[in-house]
């Protein structure tokens, strides 16, 4: 039946004035340099090469172009089901995943802690096996990276990290797609991180050098990134000929930066530390004073939700802010992740420059 549906849709034409627009979602021509990601887990970007990450971004651009700009219908995930496990609340991760998976013809199933609590009423091993028998993939937004690792070990289907205490890889894919669209290429850009040494920063550290991007990090004392992740990032920088610097001075990190990036100072689960953290992060607000020492073509990113103490309105709502396209690209990148892990689809759009 699916083959018959594809045949009908491939041959169908929608009248557009005197022309016909063909809705075509075939897999396209085989690519000699095609990256094979089908069946993989996406737990952290440290497990992926630069070419593999670029492939996911290429696929993101392809889906965005074909669906948003050309108006094509691509039921690439028809007959597929996605389990969505959320221990932490979410707006963008949930909305982008649910709408994106459904737009591609799949069925997302959302589960909160009221429905499932990893490792509490049932062992993670048993949960992984049940999910594997009923869904084609799982996206999990959890407190502990170790839960994700065990889930992936015991499951026979792809597990995707929707956020953990250590990493947030799907956010970084959206960031990189946004920067590629704006600058035309990622190689040679300097990223300036000003804020907490958190999961977003960790994911940047595991991937930026693979694109030839430099990274300048400023965090308050006591809020530096995980030492083991810093060590790996230093090795990536050495292998790729890029620069990595860590400081406690926000202006030093912003100096010459093409992209100013910050995030929440108080992540979910850290509410009791609010007073202490607000005091520690004094002087870390991104303002036009910060931007003054950045590169002339500076832009700004924030994964949201945003608080005024992290970045002032002048920067956040300025024409230099890429926050809105960054948020939208969460949808196209998670769609690309699911398509790459669950299908043999090949992008038809010409490969962007990275």
Swiss-Prot record:
Reaction catalysed by this enzyme: carbamoyl phosphate + L-ornithine = L-citrulline + phosphate + H(+)
Chief location: mitochondrion
EC number: 2.1.3.3
Activation/inhibition comment: Negatively regulated by lysine acetylation.
Active site per database record: 263, 303
Similarity annotation: Belongs to the aspartate/ornithine carbamoyltransferase superfamily. OTCase family.
Protein name: Ornithine transcarbamylase, mitochondrial
Organism: Bos taurus
Gene responsible for this protein: OTC
């Amino acid at each position: 039946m699916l083959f018959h549906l594809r045949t009908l849709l491939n041959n169908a034409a929608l009248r557009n004035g005197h022309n016909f627009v063909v809705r075509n979602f075939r897999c396209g021509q085989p690519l000699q340099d095609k990256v094979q990601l089908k069946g993989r887990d996406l737990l952290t970007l440290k497990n992926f090469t630069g070419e593999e990450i670029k492939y996911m971004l290429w696929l993101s651009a392809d889906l965005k172009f074909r669906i948003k700009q050309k108006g094509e219908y691509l039921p690439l995930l028809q007959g597929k089901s996605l389990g969505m496990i959320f221990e932490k609340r979410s707006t963008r991760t949930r909305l982008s995943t649910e709408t994106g998976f459904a737009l591609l013809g799949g069925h997302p199933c959302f589960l909160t802690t009221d429905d499932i609590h990893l490792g509490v009423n049932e062992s993670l091993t048993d949960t992984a096996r049940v999910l594997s028998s009923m869904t084609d993939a799982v996206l999990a937004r959890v407190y502990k990276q170790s839960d994700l690792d065990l889930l992936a070990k015991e499951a026979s289907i792809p597990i995707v990290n929707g956020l953990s205490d250590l990493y947030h890889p799907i956010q970084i894919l959206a960031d990189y797609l946004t920067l590629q669209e704006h600058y035309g290429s990622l190689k040679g850009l300097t990223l300036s991180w000003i804020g907490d040494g958190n999961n977003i920063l960790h994911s940047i550290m595991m991937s930026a050098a693979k694109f030839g991007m430099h990274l300048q990090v400023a965090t308050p004392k006591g809020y530096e990134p995980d030492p083991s992740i810093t060590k790996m990032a230093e090795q990536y920088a050495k292998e790729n000929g890029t620069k990595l610097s860590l400081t406690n001075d926000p202006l030093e990190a912003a100096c010459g930066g093409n992209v100013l990036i910050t995030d929440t100072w108080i992540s979910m689960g850290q509410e009791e530390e609010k007073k202490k953290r607000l005091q520690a992060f004094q002087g870390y607000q991104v303002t036009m004073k910060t931007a003054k020492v950045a590169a002339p073509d500076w832009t700004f990113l924030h994964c949201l939700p945003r608080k005024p103490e992290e970045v002032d309105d002048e920067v956040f709502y300025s024409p230099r802010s890429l926050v809105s396209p960054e948020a939208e690209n969460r949808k196209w990148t998670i769609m690309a992740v699911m398509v790459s892990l669950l299908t043999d689809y090949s992008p038809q759009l010409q490969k962007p420059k990275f």
